[in-house]
Amino acid sequence: MLEVADLEVSYGAVKVVRGVSFRVAEGEIVLLMGPNGAGKSTIAMTIAGLLRPDAGTIRFRGESLAGPAHHVLRRGLSMVAEVRRICPLQTVEDNLLLGAFIHRHDRRRVVDAMTEVQELFPVLGAKRRALASTLSGGEQQMLAVGQALMARPRLLICDEPSLGLSPRLAQELFTRLERINREGVSVLLLEQRVSIALPIARRGYVIETGRIVLEGTRSELGRDPRVIESYLGGVREDVRAASDGAARVA
């Protein structure tokens, strides 16, 4: 579905993504993990068309996102940015409708998408008339995901979706992402909280200083000493705090 090959991106004279290649197949959740400053957000923004790469190719559903049809192709993907892009003085419902408006959906598709999002996140339905500014941090993050889903994407890119959330709320959000995936949406998950994120991924990649340094299945990465030491050892409090005990590495 998504194929990134030899991607290079710079900010001025500073190279921040260096020859990165990875793929997300139809129906997969793929985790791209790494520390702050590794280049994860830059990769997400480049795929979404917000940054121009220096080199490399990005193909979505077999077509180049640098080609003449890239605007149409990008309607099939949505991104939940690290910084929430919601309007605090608009209602929850209006924020959701904004996600559909950007992708120019017809009324029937908007109604269907609204129903699906409110079933996935009941709190958004219950608070649809409330201002977004009155929501808790966890609810605002669910609103950001719901807004992205209003586009009814084939691929959902989530950049640090658990940022600022408690372990319990992060686990709840990832459980929702699993459900979204079961309903046919592929997910590219960019995260630091590997102890909670890795269990829902089929495969993963480790990125450091702009390069992919390790890749493998969930089980392979969960057993790798480098991942255990660098990405699992420091966040075991998250694992212990998960309310349902589901945050385990297979």
Regions found by a protein language model. Give the residues of each.
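Helix-to-loop junction immediately C-terminal to a conserved catalytic motif
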Residues: 48
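Conserved ABC ATPase signature
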Residues: 131-135
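ABC ATPase C-loop
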Residues: 148-149
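ABC-type ATPase nucleotide-binding domains, specifically the catalytic core motifs of the NBD
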Residues: 12, 92-112, 120-125, 216, ...
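Catalytic Walker B motif of ABC-type/P-loop ATPase nucleotide-binding domains
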Residues: 156-160
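The feature captures the beta-strand-to-loop junction immediately N-terminal to the Walker
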Residues: 33-35
